[in-house]
Amino acid sequence: MITLHILVSILLATPTIVLAENPFDGFLQELRKEAINQGIRPTTLDSVLKGLVVNPKVLALYRRQPEKKQDLSSYLKQRVSTTRITLGQKLLAEHQPLLEQVASEFGVQSRFIVALWGSESSYGRNMGDFSVVRSLATLAHGSKRKDYFRRELLVALHILDQGHIHPSKMLGSWAGAMGQCQFMPWSYDRRAIDFDQDGRRDIWFTQADVFASIANYLAAVGWKNDQTWGREVTLPPNFNSEFTNKKMALQEWQNYGVRRLNGTALPTRKIEAKLIRPTNANGRSFLVYDNYDVLLKWNRSHHFAIAIGTLADRLRPSSVLLLKNQ
């Protein structure tokens, strides 16, 4: 009896314990309030957020991102494969009328549009099958970049509220990149184009919108239609490493002994180029033009930018693979 009395006394003295609400549900409630304050309709939010749960696969992929960077040669072998080149050439010819129209409208060469299309989604064949809203909500709640993913999530909700895509078809990568050009919602909001003028900026299923959105992105951040991206070059023995990342006229690089990869002289065009020797590039060197920096604005990876430029070059007919004036 004494033991029972002591136990009862302890229980009475202990503060009442209330089971905490699911933290993710609380996050969604706060998100809903913020979205309504931004003008998103409650009916849209109810249809998208009701019953939403964390996607554990997204968190696993987020935590499993590789720390070691792939070397350039391996990266190019994967990104600029024979299969990708062959299919890209076929699709470039197949969509030539539309691509020429888009290229003329935005001032971006067709081959670069197709190269980005091929690299981002394998020409629309691999857009990802993750629910963009669920992925972004998971990352906005459980990643180290909560503010970034919350912003992207809110923009995604605006896109749905505007009727550009049905929620069930708003699919993308585990990180929230969407459609055939793999735009994050923020980029979609600013760069996506309704080229066929049907009232929707459809980067998932409308080819005209996909091509125009890619071209518009490049044009908006400074693409120069009269230039290419750059080229791989050879350096003379005992080349001064202090020239790395320097920008000079092509003629000056020629004077310092820099040559095309096949050993021939550089183009005679009056244009400046920067010498880069990226890390993990197996000692390879490149002279790059302003458009290379534009590609870095799409994806801040030297490997990526070089791969896009290389693929764009390979998409040309072999007879004009090497431009003499660029």
What are these regions (language model features)?
Residues 13-15:
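N-terminal signal peptide c-region/cleavage motif recognized by signal peptidases
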Residues 21-103:
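An acidic, Gly/Ser/Thr/Pro-rich helix-cap/linker signature
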Residues 35, 46-54, 107-124, 156-159, ...:
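Short, functionally critical alpha-helical segments immediately adjacent to catalytic or ligand/cofactor-binding
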